[in-house]
């Protein structure tokens, strides 16, 4: 038996199926934070940096606040007053990076994504090994440079000890 396309019950059936797919599809709200930077044991460093997100883009100047603890957690905020441009968080098992002006965030488990130099800044400053696509160097003036050789994202800056 063939059912005509324009029947009211068919439109209702399609609506119910569409609603079912939306509810059963499983959406997850983006993680706001992996942890809260509060309490004793946090080492806070402040500084300034120039960030070029990728090849062909202009550099952005801003302030860095980096907080780390002995459990291996690190929080980095890069801001141009009054707005946060990048927030990066790493733990030994998870990572999260947010770009508030664009309303974008990326998160994962295990080693951080090699796509974002911000996720490796603390490790680079601590002298830890980096993925081959990242290059870190210290400068004679006490500053540093972290570069993603693939995307040509660069971070040039300094932080107080």
Show which residues each predicted segment covers.
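Bacterial Sec signal peptide processing site at the extreme N-terminus
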Residues: 21-42
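Gly/Pro-enriched, hydrophobic low-complexity segments
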Residues: 77, 123-161
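Bacterial N-terminal signal peptides that target proteins for export
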Residues: 3-16
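Beta-strand-dominated lipid-handling architectures at cellular/organellar boundaries
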Residues: 59-60, 67-72, 89, 94-96, ...
